[in-house]
A protein has these predicted regions:
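Nucleotide/pyrophosphate-binding catalytic subdomain
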Residues: 1-253, 258, 362, 366-374
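Short phosphate-binding/catalytic loops that engage adenosine nucleotides
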Residues: 132, 266, 352
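A conserved active-site cap/scaffold subdomain adjacent to cofactor or substrate pockets
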Residues: 238-291, 297-304
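A conserved regulatory-domain signal marking ACT and ACT-like small-molecule sensing domains
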Residues: 280-389
């Protein structure tokens, strides 16, 4: 068994869903379980539609969402009923929000859940029409039980139920990412990028051979390739190094997903949709440990805070001063005073002031608080200092 997770960018449109179908079919012999996010932009659109509905103006936003999904279904050769069934109840929920005039956290989760619900049904139907039997799975009903902290629920997975739900599917299970249900059966969400967590929970419950996380980048690089195009791809990482990258702002894999997979001994392989034949990056306990500075992570100004407790105090300090973090990740024995001093010199010489610095308790990363407008320059300076060929 393998688990294949596809984010919103991968299922953004009919062409993307066709690529997903081809990738899943290529792995059919390995008994894939698929986890999908909502179509790109659908979650934000649903959140906005919920607020609009509470203000008495949600009908147009809901209609636009349904129309977008219907258009994708049409391009895939699927009947409108696939989308209409997925969105059944959304218009009624919007009318209820209009009457109440506010969006309670529980109702917000119920509203936003329609994104993953529609995506899973579109992908399952696209697989079926391409000749591969598939069925969409309600993650909460399938065993992703959570607490009732709506919007950022903590999973308390029922592994036996998850295995039974997967086994009951005559074909490829397509699981709604990001979603769960609390003990009362109410829909909950796992927080931003929570589909990674869903995928890791299923990989752990199933004892999967590997968890494939399919992205628009072909693996984990030594620095963000949008900032440093020549940054080299990292072939393998220990989970602790991947977690240190996440603490420094990397959004490649959700840190909770890294932790769940590592605890279960399931390797994560980050693969690129645009280059499916490439090896990607393998995150596993048997990966060689770093021997020096390995990578540079950074916060992306304007993004929500990184979903990890690492560097929380430093990040808050930086935010209070209009700043963000850039960090060095590597061997704890390497990231000592000399490296920190060299990094500070490189930043100062390049005109990037440092507000403060801190390191992780295990010494696997050191981060610097710098002005948000200078984050990308800081990444380039540190890459040139430590990682340039």
């Amino acid at each position: 068994v393998i688990v294949m997770k596809f984010g919103g960018a991968a299922v953004a449109d009919a062409a993307g869903i066709r690529r997903v179908v081809a990738l899943v079919q290529a792995e059919r012999a390995r008994a894939p379980v698929v986890v999908v996010s909502a179509l790109a932009g659908a979650t934000d659109a649903l959140l906005a539609a919920a607020d609009a509905a509470a203000a008495g103006a949600g009908e147009q936003a809901v209609a636009a969402l349904v129309a977008r999904h219907r258009a994708v279904a049409g391009e895939l050769g699927l009947p409108p009923a696939v989308v209409d069934d997925a969105f059944a109840g959304l218009a009624e929920l919007a009318r209820g929000l209009r009457l109440v005039g506010a969006v309670a956290p529980r109702l917000r989760d119920e509203f936003v859940a329609f994104g993953e619900r529609a995506s899973a049904r579109l992908v399952a139907a696209a697989l079926a029409i391409a000749g591969t039997a598939a069925a969409a799975l309600d993650a909460g009903a399938a065993g992703v039980v959570t607490d009732d902290r709506f919007g950022a629920a903590t999973p308390r997975p029922d592994a036996a139920r998850m295995r039974a739900a997967v086994a009951a599917v005559a074909g490829v299970p397509v699981v709604e990412g990001f979603l769960g249900r609390d003990a009362r059966g109410f829909v909950t969400t796992l927080g931003r990028n929570g589909s990674d967590v869903t995928a890791a929970l299923f990989a752990a419950a199933l004892g999967a051979e590997e968890l494939q996380v399919w992205k628009d980048v072909g693996g984990v690089c030594a620095a963000d390739p949008r900032v440093v195009p020549q940054a080299r791809r990292l072939a393998a990482l220990p989970p602790a190094v991947a977690l240190a990258l996440a603490a420094c702002g990397s959004r490649i894999v959700h840190p909770d997903a890294l932790a769940h997979a590592a605890a279960a001994g399931v390797p994560i392989v980050v693969r690129g949709i645009a280059s499916p034949a490439a090896a990607g990056t393998r995150i596993a306990a048997d990966a060689p440990p770093p021997t020096g500075v390995l990578a540079i992570g950074h916060d992306e100004p304007g993004d929500p805070p990184a979903p990890t407790g690492g560097f929380a105090a430093l990040r808050a300090n930086a935010a209070a001063r209009g700043g963000a973090l850039v960090g060095l990740i590597g061997a704890p024995a390497t990231l000592g005073g000399l490296v920190v001093a060299a990094a500070a010199r490189a930043l100062a010489t390049g005109g990037v002031p440092v507000f403060a610095a801190d390191s992780l308790p295990d010494g696997g990363a050191v981060a610097f608080a710098v002005p948000a407008a200078s984050v990308r320059r800081a990444v380039t300076l540190l890459h040139d200092c430590f990682l340039a060929a």
